[in-house]
Amino acid sequence: MSDAFCSDCKRQTEVVFDHSAGDTVCSECGLVLESHSIDETSEWRTFANESGDNDPNRVGGPSNPLLTDGGLSTVIAKPNGGGGGEFLSSSLGRWQNRGSNPDRALIQAFKTIATMSDRLGLVATIKDRANEIYKRVEDQKSSRGRNQDALLAACLYIACRQEDKPRTVKEICSVANGATKKEIGRAKEYIVKQLGLENGNAVEMGTIHAGDFMRRFCSNLCMNNQAVKAAQEAVQKSEEFDIRRSPISIAAAVIYIITQLSDDKKPLKDISLATGVAEGTIRNSYKDLYPHVSKIIPNWYAKEEDLKNLCSP
């Protein structure tokens, strides 16, 4: 339900949408406020034919403003019966496939972004933002000859940053169909440059904080709720100190400290695998954090005497 102004009730009232008739009806007086409306969202009901093919949706997917004509098109389907109609339909279908589709490459790119997003468990808003970034880059007609997989992965990386749900380059790389971290990094710089030229100013990427990765990293290590809470508090306190390490490295080092103070200690190798940070980098970050552990680690999680049991770097 939603609210709309009813001319009979003379005020905002709740309205009901009658999908079968396409009418918007006032829930209080029954006045039809709008009739024969078209629902542009997907229709999930399917209508089977007798040919044994997959059930087609009668309306199909919602319109996509990034595609020509909103992505809406006419498809010549096979007839249910046999005879000459089937020959005519198949002939028309071949001609349709031969026709130029300006969005064919774009649709394939969007499918690839959707697949990568699904594999990383990203929300739809990030996928849509990545699609928008890719479309803007493609409209400039300057990306030919570049690694397509790296370009799409970089669009997804930037979208995650802009939606305040950052992922590490290594995480993006794991679903990038073979594109390397170096290639994705180059593609990211290229996209930022192109979009900056388009807008006339720098592209806002969003600020990365160590806490952005903490819950996911802890989940990868199957840490208990108490340890996760302590790690989140510790990484937040660490921002008060001038620790010149990347947020991801700080997150990994904090996890190492928290697990060393618990009964469920995690080997450095496991933390490295879960966070994508090299063991040597974690050690160096731990060395920088060590002088501040008494102020970083929550008192409810570890006492002063517990902190003395930590290994000196």
Curated annotation (Swiss-Prot):
GO molecular function: RNA polymerase II general transcription initiation factor activity; TBP-class protein binding; zinc ion binding
Main localization category: nucleus
GO cellular component annotations of the record: nucleus; transcription preinitiation complex
Annotated Zn(2+) binding sites: 6, 9, 26, 29
Matching Pfam families: TFIIB, Zn_Ribbon_TF
Segments forming TFIIB-type zinc fingers: 2-34
Record key words, sorted: Metal-binding, Nucleus, Repeat, Transcription, Transcription regulation, Zinc, Zinc-finger
Compartment(s): Nucleus
GO BP annotations, alphabetical order: DNA-templated transcription initiation; transcription preinitiation complex assembly
InterPro entries: Cyclin-like_dom, Cyclin-like_sf, TFIIB, TFIIB_CS, TFIIB_cyclin, Znf_TFIIB
Spans of repeat Sequence: 116-193, 217-291
Superkingdom of origin: Eukaryota
CDD domains: CYCLIN_TFIIB_rpt1
PANTHER family the record matches: TRANSCRIPTION INITIATION FACTOR IIB-1, TRANSCRIPTION INITIATION FACTOR IIB-RELATED
Assembly, per entry: Associates with TFIID-IIA (DA complex) to form TFIID-IIA-IIB (DAB-complex) which is then recognized by polymerase II.
Family under the similarity heading: Belongs to the TFIIB family.
Biological role: General factor that plays a major role in the activation of eukaryotic genes transcribed by RNA polymerase II.
Name assigned to this protein: Transcription initiation factor IIB
Species of the source: Glycine max (Soybean)
